């Protein structure tokens, strides 16, 4: 008799299904509780005028998403140091996002924690994650260049500090890359959370790509974590689709953004993430180019940044922007996964 429950593919699929079912079942109660406590979204006055109707929509859906992901990960019972580190990054940045969300709700304004406080918090989490990944998770400081079989050694400038009986290895260049990846990804995912279903949909696609990569690497624990996150986002989308009944808030976008960065680091696809998570690169670049152009020339490149608002201002419906961004995400993530797969086969 074949015990299908022991099959890794079955376990990954089960993780997705359980996360979807849990979120679909629990979010109505979560939404009801948020409405009862008047915990609603504060909308920017300088954003698209059509978004003003979203004022007061329940937010902080990311709390339940992260709780479900954690519960499914524990329930599946397949633990590993790297997946635990990735989950810790999700929870830590999710907690920072929660403070930001709560600050907005308490003050009844669209601005929560100051950018300086958020960057400091993200930076501290990134540095701690990097140190633990190298010293506890044994993540290499080498960065693989896709399709070449060549790697860059970012551990050439390394310090070793003695802490009691422990030697703490600090590869400065690699730690800088981790810092940059964690901060840029959390914030660009946060930028993408500006339309109903946009962030959750793109995160789902990229998480599925990383579930496949981790599975290919025989890291079942990491694959299960990514699969659970993808499933939770799908369940959340049931209520976040336009017109949204709930938003994930910074709790979700910062937490899941950190999770994506962590997955790229622990699967050693740091450079390939530029393609797999290319939609977030596009979103971030649109803001950088907009600000730089305005400061240098006094003119704006886009009607509004990030770029998804530009298309809204061109007359695209919110749903059309969302679906087309999903398509672009799928193409980029699929291309990145294909490059990874071909590279490992050749290797």
Q: What residues fall within each predicted segment?
A:
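Short, Lys/Arg-rich N-terminal segment immediately upstream of the first membrane anchor
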Residues: 2-8, 54-55, 109-112, 163-166, ...
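A cross-family signal for N-terminal binding/gating loops and helix N-caps
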Residues: 35-41, 48, 52, 64
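Juxtamembrane helix-capping/reentrant segments at transmembrane boundaries
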Residues: 44-57, 108-122, 308, 313
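Membrane interface segments of multi-pass transport proteins and intramembrane proteases
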Residues: 104-114, 145-154, 163, 317
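Carboxylate/His-rich catalytic cores and anion/metal-binding grooves
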Residues: 117-134
